[in-house]
UniProtKB/Swiss-Prot annotation:
Gene3D superfamilies: Mur ligase, C-terminal domain, Mur-like, catalytic domain, NAD(P)-binding Rossmann-like Domain
NCBIfam families, per the entry: murD (TIGR01087)
Main location: cytoplasm
Biological process (GO), any one: regulation of cell shape
Role: Cell wall formation. Catalyzes the addition of glutamate to the nucleotide precursor UDP-N-acetylmuramoyl-L-alanine (UMA).
Signal peptide range in chain numbering: none
Keyword tags: ATP-binding, Cell cycle, Cell division, Cell shape, Cell wall biogenesis/degradation, Cytoplasm, Ligase, Nucleotide-binding, Peptidoglycan synthesis
Keyword Ligase: yes
Compartmental location: Cytoplasm
UniProt xrefs under Pfam families: Mur_ligase_C, Mur_ligase_M, MurD-like_N
Protein name: UDP-N-acetylmuramoylalanine--D-glutamate ligase
Record flagged with keyword DNA-binding: no
Metabolic or biological pathway: Cell wall biogenesis; peptidoglycan biosynthesis
């Protein structure tokens, strides 16, 4: 079981002898807890480290201690790597440059994420196929669409991964799932090396999370390389976005299982081996017998809600993934109609005086904000937060003609304000310097003064929320609450 004095985990799986294997769980979030729980069940020696020490972490830590783990919480707890460590399992977001991870890599200790661990720990008699989704934007929505279509087909399916539910937790369910719809972030893919998925999709590729890759000579290239890992050893279909050549190049370069196919999705008329749109219908020219000369109707565009160009792309990708799994055509439209997305995704939260207030707090980078802004004609834009190393010049240039005004707030408000000054100097801009949660109410007040009947006040920040809020949902709730108190244009008289 040993190799060069260490435990050789290169082929470790559920049937591997985990007793005596020393595993460090870096981070006690939902995925860290699930990883620790699964490894304890296999008799591994588990040490959980997290610099946080709040009630939630203490509660989870206490449960794991009862099960046999050692748990260290509080500042500095996750800074040191014990000498006897054989494996590190990191929570999403842990960078290679963080001291504990860097020490592990230097010492040749394997570092895995929860998806890698989950893949290895699937029971050989109960292998659950994965339909996996990544991309800069649209991952969560596409994962939800995929799950809903699978349910409409009568399959026992579960949305897992970056969407919020750990894969290991779902694997422990008594439900014998037929298939998983798996959302994977670039962070999770970075720490995954043995996945061999049934089918996988990269929805798009744009600048995001570049601060995570700041140590690399080519941050965007490294980010793209991690996204492309999802196609490695795919067994059935590699789904790509025809409108985003970078995703097709990833498929071309992928090392897949013999027989795996490249399947494109497009908002235009599809060619063979594509899913696309004809006369308001989503049609399949990929998974039909006579794909060179015929197409099969899957759904109507009105089945997609909320209706926006980027959300149609999400639906096309979900259709491709589920059709690759043999889902019958009628289930695609039914699944799209059945789906009710969570809030903060192009959600109309208020209408008054001819003005529509839309919460797209989930738009946490410029590409997501661009997708949202494409759906509206006249916009008062509320933007700002943590830019994560991204830029806004292209976004501002693209939409300058439809901007009635802009309100910027958050840590990197100056970056957006400077882009507006350079590329849209005619657009009125209000800068909110308040760094408390009251900033959103002030932003809504200023937006109301600029908006006119027929306008949309769009909160599509293009930035992360953690500078002020605990998450994008809280930011969206503050926007919605403030917007609902607005009566109409220039409400303060």
């Amino acid at each position: 079981m040993t190799f060069s004095g260490k435990v050789d985990l290169s082929a470790a799986d559920r049937l591997f002898d985990w007793s005596g294997v020393h595993v460090v769980i870096a981070g006690l979030g939902t995925s860290g807890y699930a990883a620790a729980d699964a490894l304890l069940e296999l008799d591994a020696t588990v040490l959980v480290l997290d610099d946080s020490d709040d009630d939630s972490h203490r509660d989870k830590g206490g449960l794991l201690e009862v099960l046999g783990a050692e748990v260290r919480l509080g500042p500095g707890s996750a800074s040191d790597l014990p000498e006897e460590t054989d494996l590190v399992v990191v929570s999403p977001g842990w960078r290679p440059t963080q001291p504990l991870v860097a020490r592990a890599l230097t010492r040749g200790i394997p570092v895995w994420g929860e998806p890698e661990l989950a893949w290895r720990l699937m029971h050989p008699d109960r292998v659950i196929p994965w339909l996996a989704i990544t991309g800069t934007n649209g991952k969560t929505t596409t994962t939800q669409m995929t799950e809903s279509i699978l349910h409409a087909a009568g399959l026992k399916a579960c949305a897992v991964g970056n969407i919020g539910r750990p894969i290991l937790e779902a694997m422990a369910d008594e439900i014998n799932y037929d298939v998983f719809a798996v959302e994977l972030s670039s962070f999770q893919l970075h720490w995954s090396n043995s996945l061999s998925l049934h089918s996988a999709a990269v929805l798009n590729l744009h600048q995001d999370h570049l601060e995570w890759y700041a140590h690399e000579s080519d941050p965007l290239g490294s980010y793209a390389a991690d996204k492309a890992r999802i196609y490695h050893q795919v067994t059935n279909s590699c789904v790509y976005n025809v409108a985003d050549p970078a995703t097709e190049h990833m498929v071309e370069d992928a090392d897949v299982v013999e027989g795996a196919r490249a399947i494109g999705f497009t908002t235009g008329t599809p060619g063979p081996s594509m899913i696309g749109i004809v006369d308001g219908l989503i049609v399949d020219r990929a998974f039909v017998e006579q794909r060179a000369t015929s197409a099969m109707e899957l759904a109507r565009l009105e089945d997609v809600h909320p209706f926006a160009p980027h959300n149609v792309e999400n639906a096309l990708a979900a259709a491709a993934l589920t059709r690759s799994f043999g889902v019958p055509a009628p289930a695609v439209g039914q699944g799209l109609r059945d789906l009710h997305l969570g809030g903060h995704r192009i959600e109309t939260v208020h209408q008054a005086g001819g003005i529509t207030w839309v919460d797209d707090s989930k738009a946490t980078n410029p590409h997501a904000a661009n997708s949202s802004m494409r759906a509206f004609e006249h916009i008062v834009w509320i933007a700002g937060g943590q830019a994560k190393g991204t830029h806004f010049d292209n976004l501002v240039t693209t939409h300058a003609g439809k901007l009635r005004g802009v309100v910027v707030l958050g840590t990197d408000r100056g970056i957006i304000a400077r882009s507006l000054a350079e590329h849209a100097p005619q657009v009125p801009v209000v800068v909110i310097d308040d760094m408390s949660r009251e900033a959103m109410a002030r932003a809504v007040h200023e937006a109301a003064k600029m908006a006119r009947p027929g306008d949309t006040v769009l909160m599509a920040p293009g930035c992360a929320s953690l500078d002020i809020w605990p998450g994008y949902a809280a930011r969206g709730e503050d926007f919605a609450n403030a917007a609902r108190h607005v009566d109409g244009p220039d409400a303060d008289g």
